[in-house]
C-alpha cells in the first residue's frame, strides 16, 4: 500500500490542527504508524485529546485513495514533509504543512533567493506597473518570484517574472486544479508550465476565505523576504508581512504618496522598520553573498509600460501596417515594438495557419521551453500570437524581415 495514502489520510483528519498532526508525526515517525496506533498510544502524545484520539479510529482510506487517483489523472504531484525536495525553510516555520500538492516543476527553494511579492487586489495602475517591473527585474537578476496568483499585485508580479523568462511559483488557497480568480486562467497555466503551483489543499478544494490566512504562512515561509507593493490600512498583504516577521524573514515595502489609500500600509511598514525598496536590487543585494553564483545587479530593465496598461490585454493605440493577407505587419528587423530576441525567434518560426506546440518551437529555436512559454505569453498579450488548444500557438501578424 502506498505510503502516500497515509499522508493524505492524516492531513484529511479535520478534528486535528496542524500542531496536533505534527506532534503525532514526531512521536510515531510516520503517518502509517499513526494510522495503526492504538487509542491508548495516541493519548500518550502531548496535546492529543480524547476526542481527537477517537476521531483517529475512523480508518477508512477511501477518501485518501480517491484524492490520489485524482492527482494521477490531473498530473498533480505530492510532496511530504519527509521528502528530500521539501524545503528546509518551510520545515522551520510554525505549523509547516505536512503535505503539499503541486503542478509543474518543484524548484529547490533552499538554493533560491525567493521573494514573496504581495499586495492589494484593488490596486492602482501604479501598483500594477510597479509589481510587474519588480517581478521582471527580480527574475532577470536571478531571484525567484513567489506570489499567490490573486488578481492585482500578485498577478502583475508573476506576469513580470514570466516576461523575463524566469522561474516563478504560486501558493494557492484552493486546490492546484482550481483556477481562482477565473480570469487568471492563462496565467495559471503559464506558471504551471514555467514553475510550480503549490497548495496544502487537495484537488477540488474551493477558495474558502479561511484558506488564505493559512496559505500566507507557506507563501512567506518559502521565501527569504516578503515585498509589499501596495496595501491599504487593512490589507491582507499586511497579514502576510506580519507572518513573515514572525518567521524571522525580512520584509520590504515600496513607498507611495502620503495621500494614497493603497500606500498607507506600505508607508507604515517602512516607518516601523521594514526595508525600503525602490528597485529590485534593494532586496536581492541582501542575499548576494549567500547566492553569489545566482544574483547579479545588472539584470535587464523592463521596457516602459503604458500608463494605463491592462495586465492581460492592453489595447494598442497605433494602427499597424496591414499585409495583403489582412494581417498586421511586424518588422522584426527594425523592431520598433521592442520585442526580445526570443519573441522574434518565435514569430519567425510560427505559422499563421497551422498551430505549433511550444515544445516544437523550443526545439527549432534551440531555446529552453520555459523561455518560449514566456515569449509566446507576451506575444499573445500584445496580440501577435493566439493560443489554439493546449500549448499550441499560431502567429496573428505578418512578419517582415527587412531594414526598410
Predicted feature descriptions by range:
Residues 1-85, 384, 389-391, 399-404:
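Short, small/acidic-rich helices and loops at N termini and domain boundaries
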Residues 2-4, 72-73, 80-404:
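Glycine-biased, small-residue-rich flexible motifs in mid-sequence functional cores and linkers
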